[in-house]
Amino acid sequence: MNEVKESLRSIEQKYKLFQQQQFTFIAALEHCRENAHDKIRPISSIEQVQSYMEHYCNNSTHRRILIMFMDICSELSKLCQHFEALHSGTPVTNSLLEKCKTLVSQSNDLSSLRAKYPHEVVNHLSCDEARNHYGGVVSLIPIVLDFMKEWIAHSEKLPRKVLQHGTT
């Protein structure tokens, strides 16, 4: 359990750095959308961010922030697998884990996803268009982190026998 908590802390630290560069992230997505002639659709999946990065990103600063986003998403996905291996779960932890796995799935539609208080990521977006186009993608990481913290909190309340069962 300590190992997953440490992994989560590490991801949270990377996310804090990413969060400080949210305007750069939005600018990178905006330029990629312009290069792709795709200004109508919102950013709707991790897969779309990956495609923009690979095919339409021609600026090293923008590429760096898009890579940072992709790396955090990849680490969250790996942590989901680690959670799954830790114990067989309860209905509550299984539900939280399924939500996390769905959210970090490459093709999951993020367009309607919005982080709520205390997360201010959507509020930091400049206008309605930005909120409509980027609200889901900027909400993804804080929502998944919240679900993971909740998973850990529920898992820590389980009897040791249940936790050990998952590792045998």
Swiss-Prot record:
Induction: Expression is activated by FOXJ1 and NOTO. Transmembrane segments: none annotated. GO terms for cellular component: acrosomal vesicle; axonemal microtubule; axonemal microtubule doublet inner sheath; ciliary basal body; ciliary base; cytoplasm; cytoplasmic microtubule; nucleus. Expressed in sperm (at protein level). Expressed from almost all the cell types of testis, with abundant expression in round and elongated spermatids (at protein level). Predominantly expressed in tissues containing motile cilia. Disruption phenotype: Deficient mice are viable, fertile, and have no clear phenotypic differences from wild-type mice. The record marks 117, 119 as: Essential for interaction with INCA1. The keyword Nucleus applies. One of its GO terms (biological process) is flagellated sperm motility. Keywords: Cell projection, Cilium, Cytoplasm, Cytoplasmic vesicle, Cytoskeleton, Flagellum, Nucleus. InterPro entries: SPACA9. It is found in: Cytoplasm; Cytoplasmic vesicle, Secretory vesicle, Acrosome; Cytoplasm, Cytoskeleton, Cilium basal body; Cytoplasm, Cytoskeleton, Flagellum axoneme. GO terms for molecular function: calcium-dependent protein binding; microtubule binding. Coiled coil: none annotated. Its main location: cytoplasm. Microtubule inner protein (MIP) part of the dynein-decorated doublet microtubules (DMTs) of multiciliated respiratory cells and the distal singlet microtubules of monoflagellated spermatozoa. Forms an extensive interaction network cross-linking the lumen of axonemal doublet microtubules. Microtubule inner protein component of sperm flagellar doublet microtubules. Interacts with CABP1 and CALR. Interacts with INCA1. Interacts with microtubules. This is Sperm acrosome-associated protein 9. It comes from Mus musculus (Mouse). The lineage of its organism: Eukaryota, Metazoa, Chordata, Craniata, Vertebrata. The gene is Spaca9.
